[in-house]
Swiss-Prot record:
It catalyses: pseudouridine(1915) in 23S rRNA + S-adenosyl-L-methionine = N(3)-methylpseudouridine(1915) in 23S rRNA + S-adenosyl-L-homocysteine + H(+). Coiled coil: none annotated. SUPFAM superfamilies: alpha/beta knot. Homodimer. This is Ribosomal RNA large subunit methyltransferase H. It comes from Bacillus licheniformis (strain ATCC 14580 / DSM 13 / JCM 2505 / CCUG 7422 / NBRC 12200 / NCIMB 9375 / NCTC 10341 / NRRL NRS-1264 / Gibson 46). The lineage of its organism: Bacteria, Bacillati, Bacillota, Bacilli, Bacillales. Signal peptide: none annotated. Keywords: Cytoplasm, Methyltransferase, rRNA processing, S-adenosyl-L-methionine, Transferase.
Length: 159
């Protein structure tokens, strides 16, 4: 399976990079993982609703340009469906079973995702009703994808 993570914003924190690199290495036994970092849109200090929409739309255009037409797109969004690790594993297994060899996870910037990106998404996934820093979400997502592969293979993984 080919897994892409399209994310807004450049990762700056060394500890996050190290964790992400570790999970990409672990996942290499199960899938090819590609992280596509896109620049965040510069925004004025006090954003109006219209300014927020413009920023999200510009970031959304960048995101959509990186999504393969045949990819199954999973947008990380607070309004998405919350799943257990086992449910995510089932979801990943179904994708592989039904011939979807490309899964693209999308992580928006600090303002979230544009309507166009949410519309393109085949599903919306939420990790919590809480908001997490978008840079940290990359690491959390990779850990859960790794856990999903381990579950699907019946391999041990700590709970």
């Amino acid at each position: 399976m080919n897994i892409s993570i399209v994310a807004i914003g450049k990762l700056k924190e060394k500890y996050l990079k190290q964790g992400i690199d570790e999970y990409i290495k672990r996942l290499s036994a199960y899938a090819k993982v590609d992280i596509i970092e896109l620049p965040d849109e510069k925004a004025p200090e006090n954003l109006s609703d219209q300014d927020m929409k413009i920023v999200k739309d510009k970031e959304g255009e960048r995101i959509l340009s990186k999504i393969s037409p045949d990819a199954h797109v999973i947008a990380l969004a607070i309004e998405g469906k919350m799943k257990s690790s086992e449910e995510l594993a089932d979801n990943m297994d179904r994708l592989a079973t039904y011939g979807k060899s490309k899964a693209t996870f999308v992580i928006g910037g600090s303002l979230g995702l544009s309507d166009a990106v949410l519309k393109r998404a085949d599903e919306k996934l939420s990790f919590s009703r809480m908001t997490f820093p978008h840079q940290l979400m990359r690491l959390i997502l990779l850990e859960q994808v790794y856990r999903a592969f381990r579950i699907n293979r019946g391999e041990p993984y700590h709970k």
